[in-house]
């Protein structure tokens, strides 16, 4: 399958959504690494079109199964009016509405949430961090609790190819990201990261969104939330969502020079984990058993390393800092602590 072009897109939309009144304006959106994404203007509403080529969109040399959009379509449909998780979705927090999915073209059409803003781009004095964090945490907690050990979800969300790619890019090479003077630290990072990456290629205990980072969380001034980018959805491990969000809150907080911004991200995280625990209820001790708590720091640490020194550095928080900068040194040190010392992450993030 060749990559879809803009000229091919409009006829496909007309076929899939015959009642859509397009205005002829199509804009390819930036910021995504995995897929090709367009905003298509319409009357009265625009829509988002997403195409998955058989490789990472920004890196054609890295093959990636375009089945990922099938998983996203399946995940979005869970929150539709007749979906199994429809009670979790409301106007305060939900994914975009799925409009159409064409597996042959690997093309997904969905609601445009352009009136909302990415979490890492909001004006912090207008978006309340406490309400936002708590609302997001409660949603993810309910999502994990409701799907916990559900055989139907386990069978329909075996997104193994994505786990293999993540292992290849994040866990397997983690010890090569950064400059390690201590051979024993490097060896421990190598072993613990590799072991986790291999274990995550199996099915886990609950549904996970799989890409819970600030650019996937869109908010407005009332703290209403829209969660986008569900192509990594998988019956996986809670740490893949909670640890992922923890890592990104930590990174955003670390690099922001403003005390107010640092406090904003800190309160966002604390409210998130409190909301998560409250929503998970009695299931929290099952979702985060001793093994999960022992391993969550590995995911947090490897996510910091791949963003500070690896292939996902460009365009994110560490991009402005040159090699040798104290910010990168501090990030590397913290990542090593989280990976090698399980209690470091447990205490730092309140698991």
What name fits each language-model region?
Residues 1-6, 108, 142-148, 152-198, ...:
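Active-site catalytic-loop/activation-segment of kinase and kinase-like phosphoryl-transfer enzymes
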Residues 74, 239-282, 300-319:
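Active-site activation/catalytic loop segments of kinase-like enzymes and analogous catalytic loops
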Residues 287, 298-351:
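ATP/Mg2+ or Mg2+-diphosphate-binding catalytic cores
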Residues 1-27:
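Juxta-kinase regulatory segment immediately upstream of eukaryotic protein kinase catalytic domains
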Residues 53, 114, 214, 232, ...:
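Short, glycine/acidic-enriched loop or turn micro-motifs at the edges of active sites
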